Amino acid sequence: MAEGNHRKKPLKVLESLGKDFLTGVLDNLVEQNVLNWKEEEKKKYYDAKTEDKVRVMADSMQEKQRMAGQMLLQTFFNIDQISPNKKAHPNMEAGPPESGESTDALKLCPHEEFLRLCKERAEEIYPIKERNNRTRLALIICNTEFDHLPPRNGADFDITGMKELLEGLDYSVDVEENLTARDMESALRAFATRPEHKSSDSTFLVLMSHGILEGICGTVHDEKKPDVLLYDTIFQIFNNRNCLSLKDKPKVIIVQACRGANRGELWVRDSPASLEVASSQSSENLEEDAVYKTHVEKDFIAFCSSTPHNVSWRDSTMGSIFITQLITCFQKYSWCCHLEEVFRKVQQSFETPRAKAQMPTIERLSMTRYFYLFPGN
C-alpha cells in the first residue's frame, strides 16, 4: 500500500507541473494578445479556474488558430520570432488546397500527380521539358502613362502580381513599360527571337494598356491620330512562320484592356474613347490572315479581360479586377487543372454581374492539346 502511494506521488507531481506549464503557455498567449481578445474576454479567462482555462481558450481560438499555433511553436521549441502574419513561402504552397481555403500562395503540384498525368494523358497534353534544362520566358508590356489619355492608376499592382505569378511558374519575366505601338511591336519582335525559346516548352505574353476593339493603345494614342498595336500583328509575330523556336509550343496571350468604349463610375475604365478601327489595318493583311491562319497560326490561346465592344474595369488602389481574379485562380487551380480549365474558373468568378460587369473571353484558340503548368515540376 505504501509502495503504491509512493509510485502515485511522482505522477501527481508531473501532473501538477504539466498543468502549470500549460497554464503558463496559455497565459503567454493572452498577455501577448495573439487572440486579439477584448477586455471582457481576457477577464473571463483570468477569472476561470485552472482546469477551465483550456475550455475558455478553446472557445475563442477558432478564428485565430494559425496565429496561436505559431506562438505555441515559439513557446515550446524556442524558435526564432516570426510575425503571426508572415508566411514561410509567400509565393508557393504545397497542394492540394483545403476546401474553401483562401490563399495568396501558388499551390504546387505533387510530383506523383505530375508523373501520373504525364503518363495517363501523354497523347493529350503538351510535353513539359525538364525543369533543370528548360528556359521559359515571359513578357509583360504595361502602359500606365499617356500623352493624351488618363493614367492607368493601379496598374503597378497588376505588374507586380503577374510577375510574381509567372516567376512562380518558372518563367523568367521581362517587363516593358510605357511604349508606343511601334515600340511595343519592336519589343515583341525582339522577344520572339530570343534563343531561350528553343529550350523552352511555352511562353506567356501579358499586355496591359488602354485599348480598342482591334488592339492595344500606345502611349501617344489620340482619337485623331491612333497609336494602336493590332492584335493580328501580335499573332503574326509569334506564328510558326516567324517564330520557329516556339513551333508546337503553347503561346499564351493575356490582355487587360478595353475592347470598346463605355462610360462608368467608381472603377477606372481601360478605354480612351469611342474609336473607329484604325486605318492601318489593311484589307490585304486581313486576306493574308484568312488564307494562312489554319496553316501558320497554331498552339495559341488568348484570354481577354472583356468581350468585344465592352470595357474592362480597374480599381486604382488594387489593380484590375480581371488580373486579380486571374492570379487567384492560377494560385488555386493550376496545380491540378489545365490552362483552359483555369481560364474557365476565372470566367465563372465573373458569372454573376457586379455593379460594373465584364466577362473575360477566350479567343483565337488553336491549341491542339491540353496545357498543364504543373507548378513545382
UniProtKB/Swiss-Prot annotation:
InterPro entries: CARD, Caspase-like_dom_sf, Caspase_cys_AS, Caspase_his_AS, DEATH-like_dom_sf, Pept_C14, Pept_C14_caspase, Pept_C14_p10. GO terms for cellular component: cytoplasm; cytosol; endoplasmic reticulum; endoplasmic reticulum membrane; extracellular region; mitochondrion; NLRP1 inflammasome complex; non-canonical inflammasome complex. It is a peripheral membrane protein. The active site is at 210, 258. Induction: In peripheral blood mononuclear cells and purified monocytes, up-regulated by bacterial lipopolysaccharides (LPS) and interferon-beta/IFNB1 at the mRNA level. However, this increase is not observed at the protein level, which remains constant in monocytes and other cell types following LPS treatment. In monocyte-derived macrophages, some up-regulation at the protein level is observed following treatment with LPS and IFNB1. In SH-EP1 neuroblastoma cell line, up-regulated by NF-kappa-B RELA/p65 at both mRNA and protein levels. One of its GO terms (biological process) is intrinsic apoptotic signaling pathway in response to endoplasmic reticulum stress. Activated by homooligomerization induced by direct binding to cytosolic LPS, in a TLR4-independent manner. In addition to LPS, CASP4/CASP11 may also be activated by oxidized phospholipid 1-palmitoyl-2-arachidonoyl- sn-glycero-3-phosphorylcholine, an oxidized phospholipid (oxPAPC), in dendritic cells, promoting adaptive immunity. The role of oxPAPC is however unclear and another report suggests that oxPAPC competes with LPS-binding and inhibits the non-canonical inflammasome in macrophages. Residues 1-59 are annotated as: Required for LPS-binding. The modification (Microbial infection) ADP-riboxanated arginine is found at residue 314. The CARD domain mediates LPS recognition and homooligomerization. Heterotetramer that consists of two anti-parallel arranged heterodimers, each one formed by a 20 kDa (Caspase-4 subunit p20) and a 10 kDa (Caspase-4 subunit p10) subunit. Upon direct LPS-binding, forms large homooligomers, resulting in its activation. These oligomers are often referred to as 'non-canonical inflammasomes'. In its precursor form, interacts with TMEM214; this interaction is required for association with the endoplasmic reticulum membrane. Interacts with CASP1. Interacts with NOD2. Interacts with SERPINB1; this interaction regulates CASP4 activity. This is Caspase-4.
